[in-house]
């Protein structure tokens, strides 16, 4: 294709998106691009001779009066048809624009366009693989392309043309090895989108040399491993606050926090607690003193609540340190192996048959690998569970790697282990910390626990595990059918083709048969021994005492050992069989049937082993070790046909576990929390942490809550414990609509359950009064991390976020990213969960009051965390609205009210007063 090929970048605005002949074009815009420059533009409004729907008018800003005297499509079709001849058709979502335009041209008598086409959505996904959104508006913001009038075709076409030029520039920067690999996969893309890779290769006069930081192995080009300088290197020593940048505000409470932290790092107790409320600058408050201590050879492990907050800590907070320090800080992020890509496995998927969508994902991954230093798949913002490819390429730990692979020495998990030895800061999350703390025993680090109020919850949750005995049986059955099938391709065919020996097959088959036959026997005996089969409750849960489960396993020890031996055999055999599979693949000895059978076997057998991962918990020696710390119970939904028997394991208390399995491996432990604690919740908190003897520092907020915020407590909301869930969802939906109609500002509603999020979302989505709003719902319209990024990129239309889980704590939404916070329900944990029932019963048996001792302090702490999402800077202003009347009408409600920051006005109102109160607050001046 000639260098001066013309690209016609087209955007349409239409009366609707359905291509059933009922909709019409109301604006056509085209921008011509040659040699990476805009050379011409064409734009026209079009009279559709039909009403323009209100939502289209609101979105595009094109009203019926604007098109009343515009030409008909018949009048401009000839011009459009001629304009597009001998061009490459480009659009952002080409499937819509090209097909819609063709349909309209044919409708008025013109032949169908026969043009090559390029889709800028797919190109953007490939070349900018880490973006959270590929909407044109979000892309233009991320790439800093001016976009003055989103959803108007002339503006969108110009922006798409500039985006196309950026994409061509990106392609021009790609190394030859990567470019050739992308070209070879280009047929999987829409239309002729892959032609841009071919064009670039054809136009290159010589090979483009690799960036010195890149290396090519096989079909993959990736970044070379980072080399950290020795952490004990001589670093110029300077006073803690000497290099304070002039652009960074000095906050008195933050400076006091830094001085206290520095003092405690040098001379403090083994465990110290810092209560630093929002606005104190908590994170920098411990990072800068820690960085200062690096000059004296100290090293740190920093743990926060979630992967999302872990990413935020690295991307935002750690990067700020460069402004304060005369040296570079070495940082490593640690997550579970499932977050990382296995290069060897990914390389083999490139040689396997794939559908077009999977090829697109592979192309994104290939580009990403030239950018990432970590191999952390979270960087890609994928919804991993929606991508079958990720089942094949995610890491399963260093122990499962093929040491003969050319990728072994470059493996990201192995790199991470090496980097960790010289890392100044190791950043992780609480879930990883409690499982892997022992790995830091010889590194003499100080442990910093950020969002410490969540460490206990995470500890208990991660020790709460389930083994579904019926699911094990189902998987074993499925696997045996796949292996022994007489009517379809089976392992017998693999043996005939000499892809597997008969001896190997028989051994594998025999072990799976052991599981298939023994687990149901064990399950039935357990059901008969421990469950009272009364068809009353939907789900019956029965706690199991240590003596009884120990005696049961002892009676059935032969069954237990049979299954345990089968598990161990499969755990050892599967990696070897997988390596054999890869060898056969490399030798091109597998046809599609044998390839698919091997893949099915590995998928099912790995799922089976995952279901049995907790089987060793039942070993007699393990039961004895955990007798005083482990809770066990059975659940069985008796009223259901085909009910599953599930065995649950839970940690009884967190204190001893944390002292033994976490704190003991570090020189010192510093706890930080941004929550407001009452005297009752603080005592509960430190007791659960097992840090009773710790020293306590407390700081004042820097915010003027009297003028920056206000709390509204709705006293006539229905009692959540007295009304059905659907009725309460109706009430919440009505109130949220009222709140949204009273203000068009970024609004977040915090829920306790995903189920209620879905119920409310379903009602709001279909309500005409919510048309101006973009509604985001956690786990409905996206993952927490994805929705957070969307919510943070403030749109021209107001956004409503329905959230739960991680949004209760640690998410930073300053300024106009969040102005109205709604708490749908006080955040009590579900009392009906068997785990909580056992905790509460145990407290009651010890003479306590479970509600006051456990349920209430946990809910109050979580409520305080939620309220803390609203005001994040001294310039923020916002409302917090509580739609749970218990905060007013129950005696314990005062404990929730006491967590509002000092000085924040609190007003009790009725539902009908909401609109007036909201309007008055936002109309008033500070």
Task: Give, region by region, the residue ranges found by the protein language model.
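Conserved coupling segment at the C-terminus of the helicase ATP-binding
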Residues: 223-231, 239-240, 336-388, 443-445, ...
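Acidic two-metal-ion nuclease catalytic site recognized across multiple nuclease folds
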Residues: 1-2, 166-236
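A substrate-engagement module of RecA-like helicase motors
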Residues: 237-238, 298, 307-422
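Walker A/P-loop
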Residues: 267-288
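Conserved RecA-like P-loop NTPase helicase motor core
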Residues: 715-724, 783-884
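Conserved non-catalytic scaffold segment of RNase H-like nuclease domains
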Residues: 2-116, 129-151
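Conserved motor-coupling elements within RecA-like helicase/translocase cores
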Residues: 416-423, 768-801
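Acidic, Mg2+-coordinating catalytic module of metal-dependent nucleases/exonucleases
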Residues: 85-105, 131, 135-197, 880
């Amino acid at each position: 294709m000639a260098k001066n090929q013309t690209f016609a970048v087209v955007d349409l605005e239409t009366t609707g998106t359905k291509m059933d002949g009922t909709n019409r074009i109301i604006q056509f815009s085209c921008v011509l691009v040659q040699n990476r420059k805009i050379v011409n533009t064409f734009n026209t409004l079009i009279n559709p001779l039909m009403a323009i729907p209100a939502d289209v008018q609101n979105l595009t800003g094109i009203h019926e009066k604007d098109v009343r005297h515009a030409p008909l499509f018949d009048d401009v079709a000839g011009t459009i048809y001629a304009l597009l001849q001998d061009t490459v058709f480009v659009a952002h979502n080409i499937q819509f624009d090209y097909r819609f335009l063709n349909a309209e041209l044919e409708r008025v008598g013109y032949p169908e366009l026969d043009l090559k086409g390029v889709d800028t959505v797919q190109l953007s996904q490939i070349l900018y693989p880490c973006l959270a959104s590929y909407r044109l508006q979000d892309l233009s913001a991320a790439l800093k392309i001016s976009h003055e009038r989103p959803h108007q075709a002339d503006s969108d076409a110009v922006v798409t043309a500039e985006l196309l030029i950026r994409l061509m520039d990106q392609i021009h920067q790609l190394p030859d090895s990567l470019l050739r690999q992308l070209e070879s996969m280009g047929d999987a893309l829409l239309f002729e989108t892959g032609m841009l890779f071919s064009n670039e290769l054809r136009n290159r006069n010589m090979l483009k040399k690799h960036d010195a930081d890149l290396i090519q192995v096989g079909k993959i080009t990736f970044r070379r491993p980072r080399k950290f300088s020795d952490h004990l290197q001589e670093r110029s020593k300077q006073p803690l606050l000497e290099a304070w940048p002039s652009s960074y505000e000095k906050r008195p409470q933050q400076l006091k926090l830094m001085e206290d932290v520095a003092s405690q790092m040098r001379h403090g107790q083994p465990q110290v607690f810092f209560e630093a409320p929002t606005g104190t600058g908590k994170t920098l408050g411990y990072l800068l003193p820690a960085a200062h201590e690096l000059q004296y050879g100290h090293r740190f492990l920093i743990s926060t609540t979630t992967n999302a907050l872990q990413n935020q800590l690295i991307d935002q907070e750690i990067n700020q340190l460069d402004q304060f320090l005369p040296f570079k800080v070495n940082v490593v992020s640690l997550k579970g192996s499932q977050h990382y890509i296995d290069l060897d496995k990914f390389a083999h998927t490139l040689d396997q048959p794939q559908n077009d969508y999977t090829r697109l994902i592979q192309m994104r991954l290939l580009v990403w690998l030239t950018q990432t230093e970590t191999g952390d798949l979270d960087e890609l913002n994928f919804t991993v569970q929606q991508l079958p490819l990720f089942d094949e390429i995610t890491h399963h730990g260093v122990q499962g790697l093929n040491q003969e692979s050319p990728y072994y020495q470059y493996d990201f998990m192995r790199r991470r282990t090496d980097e960790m030895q010289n890392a100044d800061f190791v950043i992780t999350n609480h879930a990883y910390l409690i499982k892997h703390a022992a790995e830091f025993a010889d590194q003499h680090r100080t442990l910093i626990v950020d969002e410490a109020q969540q460490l206990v919850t995470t500890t208990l949750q991660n020790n709460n595990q389930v083994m579904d005995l019926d699911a094990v049986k189902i998987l074993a059955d499925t696997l045996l059918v796949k292996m022994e099938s007489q009517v379809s391709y089976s392992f017998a065919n693999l043996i005939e083709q000499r892809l597997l020996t008969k001896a190997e097959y028989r051994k594998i088959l025999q072990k799976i048969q052991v599981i298939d036959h023994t687990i149901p026997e064990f399950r039935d005996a357990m059901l008969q021994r421990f469950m009272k089969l009364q068809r009353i409750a939907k789900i019956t849960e029965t706690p199991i005492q240590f003596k009884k489960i120990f005696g049961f396993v002892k009676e059935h020890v032969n069954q237990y050992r049979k299954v345990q031996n089968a598990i161990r055999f499969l755990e050892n055999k599967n990696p070897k069989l997988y390596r054999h599979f890869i060898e056969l693949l490399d030798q091109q000895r597998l046809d599609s049937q044998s390839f698919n059978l091997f893949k099915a076997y590995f998928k099912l057998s790995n799922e089976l082993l995952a279901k049995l991962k907790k089987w060793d918990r039942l070993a007699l020696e393990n039961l004895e070790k955990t007798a005083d710390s482990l809770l066990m119970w059975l659940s069985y939904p008796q009223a259901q046909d085909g009910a599953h028997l599930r065995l649950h394991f839970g940690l009884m208390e967190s204190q001893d576990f944390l002292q033994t399995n976490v704190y003991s491996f570090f020189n010192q432990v510093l706890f930080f929390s941004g929550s407001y604690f009452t005297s009752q919740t603080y005592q509960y908190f430190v007791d659960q942490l097992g840090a009773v003897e710790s020293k306590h520092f407390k700081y004042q907020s820097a915010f003027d809550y009297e003028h920056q915020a206000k709390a509204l407590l709705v006293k006539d909301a229905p009692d959540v414990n007295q009304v059905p869930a659907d009725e309460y969802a109706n009430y919440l939906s009505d109130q949220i609509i009222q709140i949204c109609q009273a203000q068009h500002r970024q609004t977040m509603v915090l829920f306790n359950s995903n189920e209620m999020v879905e119920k409310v979302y379903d009602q709001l989505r279909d309500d005409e009064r919510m048309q101006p709003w973009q509604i985001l719902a956690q786990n409905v319209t996206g993952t927490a991390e994805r929705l957070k990024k969307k919510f943070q990129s403030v749109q021209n239309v107001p956004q409503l976020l329905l959230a739960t889980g991680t949004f209760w704590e640690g998410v930073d939404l300053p300024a106009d990213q969040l102005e109205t916070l709604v708490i749908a329900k006080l955040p009590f944990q579900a009392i009906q969960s068997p785990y909580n029932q056992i905790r509460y019963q145990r407290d009651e048996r010890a003479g306590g009051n479970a509600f006051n001792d456990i349920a209430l302090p946990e809910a109050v702490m979580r409520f305080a965390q939620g309220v803390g999402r609203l005001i994040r800077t001294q310039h923020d202003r916002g409302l917090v609205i509580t739609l749970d009347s218990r905060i007013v009408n129950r005696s314990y409600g005062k404990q929730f009210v006491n967590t509002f920051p000092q000085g924040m006005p609190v007003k009790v109102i009725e539902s009908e007063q909401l609109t007036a109160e909201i309007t008055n607050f936002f109309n008033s001046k500070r």
